[in-house]
Amino acid sequence: MTCQLARFYGLPLRSSGVCAANVPDGQSIWETSNSLWAAVQSGSNIIYHAAGWLEGGLIASPEKFIMDCEIIQQIQRYMDPEIFSTDTDSIAISAIKEVGSTGHFFGVEHTQSRYENAFYQPFLSDWKNYEAWEAAGAVWTPERAYKIYQQILN
C-alpha cells in the first residue's frame, strides 16, 4: 500500500533488499532475488541493502556482493524498455512473414542483426553443462565470486 500511495502522490519511494542467510548460498540468492524483484517492480526510486548483505545486515560479504551484482544486472536487463518494445520491427512481423510456417529464424536478417546482444551475458554464472563444469574444476559460484572480488582489488 505504501508503494501505491507514493505513486499516487508522486513521492519518492525507498525500499530494501532482504537476506537472513548466514553464508552466500542458495538461500541467500533466492532471498535477495525475491526482495529485489519486489523492490524494483514496486517502482522504488532507491533500494538500500541491495547487495552483499548476509545475516540481516550483520555480515558484509564480498562474494555475496559480487553474486548480488549479477542479480541486479539481470533485473536491470529485464527491465530495459527494449525488452518490452512492441513496435513492428521489435516483434519481427516482417521476419515472421519471411519465415512462414516451414522455415526457421536463424537465417533471417532480423535474427542475425540481434543475435549477438539479444541475450543477457552473465559475468559470474556458469552456463556450462554439468560435465563441462566438472571438467573445468567444478568451481562453485561463491568461489568464482571470490576470484572476481580479488581481481577487482588487484
Show where each model-derived region lies.
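Catalytic-core signal marking the mid-to-C-terminal active-site face
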Residues: 63-154
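Glycine-rich anion/phosphate-binding loop at the beta-strand->alpha-helix junction
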Residues: 1-71
